[in-house]
């Protein structure tokens, strides 16, 4: 009994830490251009998790952009519906954010985050974020 407990204590944290998300993107885009960000995940399958895009403009609160569900269906914030597309590639373990007609006000830190499908819990995993600056 004690041996199993010790193994659990030693291996459980590493399992948690191995579940990661990493955003990547161009850093800077010009007004009216399109933005494409990639979220690469590891340690879990996109067939079991919802992945969300969230952004935080400088000195402002977090803003929900949208989500891609396990089956590939999406929900996008009403204010961004005509500009945003979220897709994914389960095999590559990547989720993509496409945003058209970029404006200066779209300057923000962009994050991807995830929750296990079928749960109403908190955002389980977060990426470190990627800064996007819109400037001419």
Swiss-Prot record:
TM spans (from-to): none
User: Molecular function terms in GO for this entry?
Assistant: antigen binding
- Top-level taxon of the source organism: Eukaryota
Which cellular component terms (GO) are annotated to the entry? extracellular region; immunoglobulin complex
Q: Keywords for this entry? A: Adaptive immunity, Immunity, Immunoglobulin, Signal
Tell me the ranges covered by the Ig-like domain, including all copies. Answer: 19-128
Q: Which residues form the signal peptide?
A: 1-18
Q: Which GO terms describe its biological process?
A: immunoglobulin mediated immune response
Q: What is this protein called?
A: Ig heavy chain V region XIG8
